[in-house]
C-alpha cells in the first residue's frame, strides 16, 4: 500500500473512531438513554446482509427509534453507494427513522463546502435522497442530545443541556487534538479528526489569535467559577488560560444555551437597579421605577401612573449600556466573574463583550420596552415585590 493510501485509510479510521467516542461518551458520561451498535448490516430475507452502516443509535425512550450513521472524510467518495444502501435499508428495516452521513468538524473548508452543498441538495425539492442529512460530528451530537432529552421536564432539561454546553466548551478548549490542528492544520488534519475544531478556531480567532502563527503551548479551561458575593451563580461559565509562543491570555466566557427568543436575565428588587444606576431615591426616574415595580406591567403603569411611563420612555434608554453591564456583571467579587466572551450554542456565535454590548443595543432597543433592549415584567406571584427583566437571545 502506497503512502497516500495509508494516510487515506488512517484518516477514515480516525473519523470512525471520533464518532464512536462521541456517541459512547453521550451514553456513558452524559447518561443519555441510548443503545449503540457498531457495524450495522442488514439484507433481504434469505440473502446476505449486504447493506451496511457504521453505527446504529437506538433511543430506548422513544419506542426504540433507530438512527444510522455513515462516517466519512469526503462527501464525494462513496456517497452514491451510501445512498444505494440507505434506499434498501429503508425498504427492509421499518425501525430506522433517520440515516446520516457524518463528517469530522475538522475537514478542510473545501470539503465543508461540499458537505453544505449536499445537505442543501438532500433537503431541497428537486433531488431524491434516502439520507436524512449530512452532518458534522458535533451537529450529530447536538441532535442526539436534543432527541434524547425531549421527554425530560423543561426545568431539568434546561439544566442538563446548560451543564452539557459548559462541559463541552471546557473539553473542546482542553482537547489536544484541537491544539495540534491549530498549530499545523495542513499536516495534522490528514490523520487527526475533531468534532469541535471549527468552534475552537472561532473562539481563538475572536481573541485575536491566528491559526498556525500563534503557536499554542498550553490551554487550561475550567467551569469551576467562584460564586457571587450573594452566593448566586456568576455570568462567567468557563474561564480559559491560553499560553502561546509569545503571550499568555485569560478569557472568561458566558455560554448562552437556549432555543427561546427571550430569557429571564434578572429578578430582584428595583432598589438594586436604582443603586447600580447611581440614582437618588428622589430622582423622578427612581420613582418611576418604583411605580413600575408596584404595578408590574407597562399597561398598568400607563393606567395608574401615566407620568411615570413617560419618564421611563424618555429616560431609561439613556442608561442602556449601564443596564446591560448591571444585568451581565452583578455583585462581582473576583475578576474571573467578569465576562470577556459570549458564546451562543443553539445558533452558534462568538462575541467579545464590547462588540456584543454595541450589537445588542443596536439590534434590540426597538424590540424591547421603554426604549431599552429588554422586556420588563414581574416574577410569577411576585407582583409589587420584585421586577423581572427578560433579554433577547440570537434565535
From Swiss-Prot:
It comes from the Bacteria. Its EC number is 3.1.21.4. InterPro entries: Restrct_endonuc-II-like (IPR011335), Restrct_endonuc_II_MspI (IPR015291). The gene is hsdFR. Pfam families: Endonuc-MspI. GO terms for molecular function: DNA binding; type II site-specific deoxyribonuclease activity. Keywords: Endonuclease, Hydrolase, Magnesium, Nuclease, Restriction system. Signal peptide: none annotated. It catalyses: Endonucleolytic cleavage of DNA to give specific double-stranded fragments with terminal 5'-phosphates. Homodimer. One of its GO terms (biological process) is DNA restriction-modification system. This is Type II restriction enzyme BsuFI. Its cofactor is Mg(2+). The keyword Hydrolase applies. It is an enzyme of class 3 (hydrolase).
Amino acid at each position: 500500500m502506497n503512502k497516500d493510501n495509508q494516510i487515506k485509510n488512517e484518516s477514515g479510521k480516525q473519523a470512525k473512531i471520533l464518532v464512536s467516542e462521541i456517541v459512547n461518551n453521550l451514553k456513558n458520561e452524559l447518561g443519555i438513554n441510548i443503545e449503540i451498535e457498531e457495524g450495522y448490516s442488514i439484507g433481504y430475507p434469505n440473502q446476505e446482509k449486504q447493506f451496511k452502516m457504521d453505527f446504529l443509535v437506538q433511543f430506548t425512550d422513544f419506542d426504540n427509534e433507530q438512527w444510522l450513521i455513515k462516517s466519512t472524510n469526503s462527501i464525494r467518495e462513496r456517497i452514491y453507494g451510501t445512498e444505494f444502501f440507505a434506499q434498501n435499508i429503508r425498504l427492509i428495516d421499518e425501525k430506522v427513522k433517520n440515516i446520516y452521513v457524518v463528517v469530522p468538524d475538522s475537514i478542510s473548508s473545501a470539503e465543508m463546502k461540499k458537505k453544505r452543498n449536499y445537505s442543501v441538495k438532500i433537503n431541497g425539492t428537486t433531488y431524491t435522497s434516502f439520507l436524512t442529512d449530512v452532518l458534522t460530528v458535533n451537529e450529530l451530537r447536538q441532535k442526539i442530545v436534543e432527541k434524547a432529552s425531549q421527554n425530560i421536564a423543561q426545568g431539568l432539561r434546561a439544566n442538563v443541556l446548560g451543564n452539557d454546553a459548559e462541559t463541552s466548551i471546557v473539553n473542546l478548549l482542553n482537547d489536544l487534538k484541537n491544539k495540534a490542528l491549530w498549530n499545523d492544520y495542513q499536516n495534522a488534519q490528514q490523520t487527526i479528526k475533531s468534532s469541535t475544531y471549527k468552534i475552537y478556531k472561532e473562539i481563538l480567532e475572536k481573541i485575536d489569535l491566528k491559526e498556525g502563527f500563534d503557536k499554542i503551548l498550553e490551554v487550561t479551561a475550567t467551569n469551576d467559577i467562584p460564586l457571587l458575593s450573594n452566593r448566586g451563580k456568576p455570568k462567567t461559565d468557563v474561564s480559559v488560560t491560553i499560553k502561546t509562543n509569545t503571550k499568555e491570555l485569560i478569557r472568561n466566557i458566558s455560554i448562552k444555551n437556549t432555543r427561546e427568543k427571550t430569557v429571564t436575565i434578572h429578578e430582584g428588587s428595583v432598589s438594586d437597579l436604582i443603586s447600580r444606576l447611581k440614582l437618588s431615591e428622589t430622582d423622578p426616574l427612581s420613582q418611576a421605577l418604583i411605580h413600575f415595580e408596584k404595578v408590574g406591567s407597562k399597561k398598568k403603569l400607563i393606567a395608574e401612573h401615566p407620568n411615570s411611563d413617560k419618564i421611563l420612555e424618555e429616560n431609561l434608554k439613556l442608561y442602556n449600556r449601564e443596564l446591560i453591564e448591571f444585568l451581565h456583571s452583578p455583585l462581582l467579587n473576583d475578576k474571573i466573574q467578569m465576562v470577556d466572551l459570549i458564546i451562543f450554542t443553539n445558533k452558534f456565535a462568538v462575541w467579545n463583550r464590547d462588540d456584543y454590548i454595541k450589537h445588542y443595543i443596536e439590534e434590540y432597543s426597538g424590540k424591547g420596552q421603554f426604549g431599552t433592549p429588554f422586556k420588563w415584567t414581574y416574577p410569577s406571584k411576585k407582583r409589587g415585590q420584585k421586577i423581572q427583566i427578560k433579554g433577547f437571545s440570537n434565535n
